[in-house]
Amino acid sequence: WIMGHMVNAIAQIDEFVNLGANSIETDVSFDSSANPEYTYHGIPCDCGRTCTKWEHFNEFLKGLRKATTPGDSKYHEKLVLVVFDLKTGSLYDNQASDAGKKLAKSLLQNYWNNGNNGGGAYIVLSIPNLAHYKLITGFKEALTSEGHPELMDKVGYDFSGNDDIGDVANAYKKAGVTGHVWQSDGITNCLLRGLDRVRKAVANRDSSNGYINKVYYWTVDKRQSTRDALDAGVDGIMTNYPDVIADVLNESAYKAKFRIASYDDNPWETFKN
């Protein structure tokens, strides 16, 4: 999965997919009542990027729905996964469940079209704080009470705080999550970070009793760091330059071992070769 980083304006969906992304990451900010409000990152952000592009969240979802609904004029067949980077740092811990419920209702209405031929991409809810695990339970409760528990089949999870792997496992236990787990590791492109924790996450993924299904590394903009991440065995790379990642995947060393994921590749299944 080549994951386009910080795609917060509808026009950027086309831009990143056309550069080679088959997945995008979108920031979601919340208002003081825990409603998802804008797709917005703000300052500071990655080096070399404009930090202030934004849409109203529900409007972004409508644009995203068009991009992921077969038959629509804006449809991109290769856009198969969307990571919502949920900026819950503005919320009190006790608002996490409400944020999950409100997020689910927004998605149900504006993305999934109330279960009627809505957008088809897989969705990862990426949460920066382990204490906010109830966002997951709230999300699930809302979809169930709205009569669409089947949509949870399209939803996965990530805790993005670079926490200890054991602590992350514990948070999932509390949330009742037993699958659909993506594990991120990384840092802004302005700084360097080693691959030690990535290797631990990959080892967990590949062990018989691990909780992780997929591992992704962020934010990677250079060819050598792309090669290093691929050598470590990641499933996804988040980047500001999808074309760089695509180029490296075309190198003879990687062409035989990796391919770009399509809609038929289940992002919740651990890859066994």
Curated annotation (Swiss-Prot):
GO terms for biological process: killing of cells of another organism; lipid catabolic process. Keywords: Cytolysis, Dermonecrotic toxin, Disulfide bond, Glycoprotein, Hemolysis, Lipid degradation, Lipid metabolism, Lyase, Magnesium, Metal-binding, Secreted, Toxin. It is found in: Secreted. It is an enzyme of class 4 (lyase). It catalyses: an N-(acyl)-sphingosylphosphocholine = an N-(acyl)-sphingosyl-1,3-cyclic phosphate + choline; an N-(acyl)-sphingosylphosphoethanolamine = an N-(acyl)-sphingosyl-1,3-cyclic phosphate + ethanolamine; a 1-acyl-sn-glycero-3-phosphocholine = a 1-acyl-sn-glycero-2,3-cyclic phosphate + choline; a 1-acyl-sn-glycero-3-phosphoethanolamine = a 1-acyl-sn-glycero-2,3-cyclic phosphate + ethanolamine. Binds 1 Mg(2+) ion per subunit. GO terms for molecular function: lyase activity; metal ion binding; phosphoric diester hydrolase activity; toxin activity. Glycans are attached at residue 250. The keyword Magnesium applies. Disulfide bonds join 45-51, 47-190. Dermonecrotic toxins cleave the phosphodiester linkage between the phosphate and headgroup of certain phospholipids (sphingolipid and lysolipid substrates), forming an alcohol (often choline) and a cyclic phosphate. This toxin acts on sphingomyelin (SM). It may also act on ceramide phosphoethanolamine (CPE), lysophosphatidylcholine (LPC) and lysophosphatidylethanolamine (LPE), but not on lysophosphatidylserine (LPS), and lysophosphatidylglycerol (LPG). It acts by transphosphatidylation, releasing exclusively cyclic phosphate products as second products. This is Dermonecrotic toxin LapSicTox-alphaIB1b3. It comes from Loxosceles apachea. The lineage of its organism: Eukaryota, Metazoa, Ecdysozoa, Arthropoda, Chelicerata.
